Amino acid sequence: MQETAIRYLGLFGGDASKQALAELYASSSDVQVKKAVLQSFMVSGQKARVLAAARGEKSEELRKSAIHLLGVMGAQTELWEMYQAEPSVEVKKSILHAMFVGGGSERLTEVARSEKDPELRKAAIHSLGVMGDRTGPVLLSIYASDPDRDIRRQILHALFVQGNVKALIQIARTEKDPELRKEAVSHLSHMGSKEATDFLVELLNK
């Protein structure tokens, strides 16, 4: 009942309701209630309050919930500022996912290219893959310029996730590392497209 009332206030309440929700968030120790209030903040466009929770909440679960909501709200600038200041790798992964939710391919590309932590680079590359083949040229560019085999493997998987047959064929034709070439061919064998099948037949006939 309480969470239903919280959702109602977020959808239909005025300034007094917003203030009541803020006071409830500050006074409650119930994580589920706080999550419901954060959701209401998001629905009613109270970005500053969601941002305050994302930055200052002691509960990592609530921080991650607020960060996700910032992604839904399209708060790319605020998320990027948080990412640069955040020491926790796990929280940074949540920020990257929120950037993905908000369609922030530009910042994800920046992380995929230049982040020093390999796990965060891989997370950014994965998100770029899930965003569809419009990020294919970026992924190919990173693949061509980065000699790290693990990063290249992550890019191959991202290209597979987005169904980018052309990019995988290009890599399978030109890659000199036999393991990576084999991996590209393996991805193509699971894609079920005519173009991929034709390429695999071509390989068999060589």
Predicted segments, located by residue:
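Core register positions within helices of long alpha-helical scaffolds
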Residues: Y8-L11, L24, S40, L69, ...
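Amphipathic alpha-helical scaffolding segments comprising HEAT/armadillo-like alpha-solenoid repeats
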Residues: G14-S27, S44-G56, M73-A85, G102-S114, ...
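Ankyrin-repeat and related helical/solenoid repeat scaffolds used for protein-protein interactions
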Residues: R149-G192
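Eukaryotic tandem repeat interaction scaffolds
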Residues: S94-A98, R107, A112, D117-Y143, ...
